[in-house]
Amino acid sequence: MEITHLPEDNLFKTVVDGYTAYVTYIIRDGKLDIRHTIVPPEIGGRGIAAQLVKATYDYALKHHLQPIATCSYAVVWLQR
């Protein structure tokens, strides 16, 4: 699965079977806050959300930002 980062839109996205899934974030005060994780039900249950959150998390660490989450899915993912 190819994940694309669109920094001008503050999101990571992927297209699977013609459906777009994405994570949105904001950067403020040295923190990257994962705000929303959206995966259409047609492509749910395939681990897509986890891969998108991981890509966002990895980006935060690479850029010396503290990853935090407002998104309930990402909160649980970050606790693992």
Where are the regions a protein language model picked out?
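Conserved N-terminal entry element of GNAT/NAT acetyltransferase domains
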Residues: 1-5
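Structural motif
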Residues: 6-8, 28
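Conserved beta-hairpin
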Residues: 10-20
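Glycine-rich phosphate/pyrophosphate-binding loop shared by adenosine-nucleotide-utilizing enzymes
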Residues: 19-22, 32
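A conserved beta-turn-beta hairpin within the catalytic core of GNAT-like acetyltransferases
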Residues: 26-35, 66-68
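A short, internal acetyl-CoA/4′-phosphopantetheine-binding micro-motif in the GNAT/acyltransferase core
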Residues: 37-44
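Conserved acetyl-CoA-binding loop-helix of GNAT-fold acetyltransferases
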Residues: 45-58
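Conserved GNAT acetyl-CoA-binding A-motif
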Residues: 58-72
